[in-house]
From Swiss-Prot:
InterPro entries in alphabetical order: EF-G-like_DII, EFG_II, EFG_III, EFG_III/V, EFG_IV, EFG_V, EFG_V-like, G_TR_CS
Similarity comment: Belongs to the TRAFAC class translation factor GTPase superfamily. Classic translation factor GTPase family. EF-G/EF-2 subfamily.
UniProt GO molecular function: GTP binding; GTPase activity; translation elongation factor activity
Purpose: Catalyzes the GTP-dependent ribosomal translocation step during translation elongation. During this step, the ribosome changes from the pre-translocational (PRE) to the post-translocational (POST) state as the newly formed A-site-bound peptidyl-tRNA and P-site-bound deacylated tRNA move to the P and E sites, respectively. Catalyzes the coordinated movement of the two tRNA molecules, the mRNA and conformational changes in the ribosome.
Pfam families, A to Z: EF-G_D2, EFG_C, EFG_III, EFG_IV, GTP_EFTU
UniProt protein name: Elongation factor G
């Protein structure tokens, strides 16, 4: 175990990285091996055995997929590396989004037999959104069908990246033995069974020619990144190892290049050079621009540098409920210093909190520390109100960092306790789970009294139900999955709402004239409120009540009671009574006017459309496509990847329930698919009639 002081390395020796990948590219195994070789693990975890460190929730151990991003810290050659494990399954994109917000760099892991797969495209685009510098690791080089250069080429064709291989594999499939370092021009072989002993040797004669050609290709790409080096290169001068690394590092941090390495994590080959590459090419907190925030007092933009003397600023990126110490709030420190036992200000909530303990996490073990500094990723105990996306800062100089956006849920399930004893436990458990996961929404249906949970996909909700049983001991019954339909309007309409009550004593008086109009989808807004009244016909202090009345009415549309979206509400006119007018009266009048206007505005039903990507052997493609056509799907593209076909389609969510079973029988279990939300679109009239009838 390192001594405490070693933990606080200089900032330039700190790396905050994520490991991102398609669901089966071997990300968890890669993380495991990193922890093993950096000395934090004493046995080799194997996902198939279910004893890995970062996959520590029982569901993950069973399913072999990573759901919760656990933050882990380890050391390599005097550098400290904080790793945030991100899930590769599409139902968990919220976890990926929040992990990417707080990372400085990432390792993108690919399966060398497939290269870029559909989910890796999604994660890559999310990383682009946050400008995260990346290096790529072509894993599974020992698998049948592994082809390093084909896999590298997919980075260009599918991701428009600029990959620069800095290694070349020695053999592939069962003959994969090691790698050639094209910068040092040395061959690296792994000698011991567990891969902890490796040695550099001269490049074997039979590979020398190819290695020189590959080095030349690398140098050419490196030279294109820097004017000075380009001149040297064109004049045939020697370019040193240091220069190559310096240029590659700069270009990686600026997102102009992606160094590519290869290996086979499960066979314990290729991990140590990957760790060296994390240090060589990925940024420390000092290499990145200061974090941007908004001053609470006046909304001015301020920047916080990664410096202990700056005011404290941190972003909460995860909340977990730990069975032993309660609520753990994970945060990334951008500036300043925070001691345990001190007060911190949550500027998002406008509340002051005391952080009683600070812990560094090693997957599911934890070590307590006295303070945190810039660049640290830690978890705090004692923060009651803090949630994902909140800013924690110095009370004297409060700022707000930009919030993390999460997508709206698209699928719902009714859920009820199996017995009376489960009733109270269910409420508590759902509260804890929705606090951890911002894409899980919980509500009670006013009419039926049922508890409804909503999320990002079937798997997402299955796992929630599973966790209720295992972690919280709550037995539940669940209904059929329901689509989260929405309602909107196709044309503007006006209406008036008048609420007048005259009973003994003070009456009630509210009067509102409204226009509602559709908001085009591309504006990306679900609601906008505009006050166009003039001459004080309605005093300004009633406007918030009018807006609240409209929002309440929007929760249940006129067609089938689904939430209303993409509507702009404009208050045109109205009147008030000096004595009888109240917020309550205006809220009711606005709600009446809105409901009336909705009826005239040609309301329509919207349904979630999913992007579906199916990977299948060619012989099943005909059956799969004709089945898709029967499900109202639109085929967008057909691609060939090796001996497999990739079908990309847009399909209504309502047509996909139980699709896993259907696809299994259509392809004898050989096809796989991933699905994610794309957009909302109008439901065809005949189908809308059926949905409305059921309601």
């Amino acid at each position: 175990m390192e001594n405490v002081e070693a933990r606080y390395v200089d900032l330039d020796k700190l790396r905050n990285i994520g490991i991102m990948a398609h669901i089966d590219a071997g990300k968890t195994t890669t993380t495991e091996r990193i922890l093993y070789y950096t000395g934090r693990k004493h046995f080799l975890g194997d996902v198939d055995e279910g004893n890995t460190t970062t996959d520590w929730m029982p569901q993950e151990k069973e399913r072999g997929i990573t759901i919760q991003s656990a933050a882990t810290t380890c050391f390599w050659k005097g550098y400290r590396i904080n790793i945030i494990d991100t899930p590769g399954h599409v139902d968990f994109t919220a976890e990926v989004e929040r992990a990417l917000r707080v990372l400085d760099g990432a390792i993108a892991v690919f399966d060398a037999t497939a290269g870029v797969e559909p989910q890796s495209e999604t994660v890559w685009r999310q990383a682009d959104k946050y400008n995260v510098p990346r290096i790529a690791f072509m894993n599974k080089m020992d698998k049948v069908g592994a082809d390093f250069y084909m896999a590298v080429e997919t980075l260009v064709t599918k991701l428009k990246a600029n990959p620069i291989p800095v290694q070349m594999p020695i053999g592939s499939e069962k003959d994969f033995q090691g790698v050639i370092d094209l910068i040092k021009m040395k061959a690296i072989y792994w000698v011991s069974e567990d891969g902890s002993v490796y040695e550099e040797r001269d490049i074997p004669e039979e590979l020398r020619e190819e290695a020189e050609m590959r080095r030349e290709e690398m140098l050419e790409k490196v030279a294109e990144l820097d004017e000075e080096i380009l001149e040297k290169y064109l004049e045939g001068e020697e370019i040193s190892e240091e220069e190559i690394k310096r240029i590659l590092r700069k270009a990686t941090i600026e997102n102009r290049a992606v160094p590519v390495l290869c290996g086979a994590a499960k066979a314990n080959k290729g991990i140590q050079p990957l760790l060296d590459a994390v240090i060589d090419y990925l940024p420390s907190p000092l290499d990145l621009p200061p974090v941007k925030g908004w001053r609470v007092s006046d909304g001015e933009i301020v920047y916080r540098k990664p410096d202990e003397n700056e005011p404290f600023t941190a972003l909460v990126f995860k909340v977990q409920v730990d069975p032993y110490i309660g609520k753990l709030v994970y945060f990334r420190v951008y500036s300043g210093r925070l001691e345990k036992g001190s007060y911190v200000y949550n500027s998002t909530k406008g509340q002051r909190e005391r952080i009683s303990r600070i812990v560094f996490m090693h997957a599911d073990k934890r070590e307590e520390v006295d303070y945190v500094r810039p660049g640290d990723i830690a978890a705090g105990v004692g923060l009651k109100v803090s949630q994902t996306g909140d800013t924690l800062c110095d009370e004297k100089e409060p700022v707000i960092l930009e919030k993390i956006d999460f997508p709206e849920p698209v699928i719902s399930l009714a859920i009820e306790p199996a017995t009376k004893a489960d009733e109270e436990k269910l409420v508590k458990a759902l509260l804890a789970l929705s606090e951890e996961d911002p894409t899980l929404q919980v509500r009670v249906d006013k009419e039926t009294g049922e508890t409804i949970i909503s999320g990002m996909g079937e798997l997402h909700l299955e796992i929630v139900v599973d966790r209720l049983k295992r972690e919280f001991g709550v037995n539940v019954r669940v209904g059929q999955p329901q689509v989260a339909y929405r309602e909107t309007i196709k044309r503007p309409a006006e209406a008036e709402g008048k609420y007048i009550r005259q009973t003994g004593g003070r009456g009630q008086y509210g009067h509102v004239i409204l226009r509602i109009e559709p908001i085009p989808e591309e504006e990306g807004k679900n609601f906008e409120f505009i006050d166009k009244t003039v001459g004080g016909v309605i005093p300004k202090e009633f406007m918030p009540a009018i807006e609240a009345g409209i929002k309440e009415a929007m929760m249940s549309g006129p067609l089938a009671g689904y939430p209303v979206v993409r509507v702009r509400a404009v208050v045109l006119d109205g009147s008030y009574h000096e004595v009888d007018s109240s917020e309550m009266a205006f809220k009711i009048a606005a709600s009446m006017a809105f409901k009336e206007a909705m009826k005239k505005a040609q309301p329509v039903l919207l349904e979630p459309i999913m992007k579906l990507e199916i990977t299948t052997p060619e012989e099943y493609m005909g059956n799969i496509i004709s089945d898709l056509n029967s499900r109202r799907a639109k085929i967008e593209s057909l691609e060939t990847r090796g001996h497999l076909k990739i079908v990309v389609a847009k399909i209504p969510l309502s047509e996909t329930f139980g699709y896993a079973t259907v696809l299994r029988s259509l392809s004898q279990g050989r096809a796989s698919y991933i699905m994610q939300f794309s957009h909302y679109q109008e439901v065809p009239e005949k189908i809308a009639e059926k949905i409305i009838k059921v309601v």
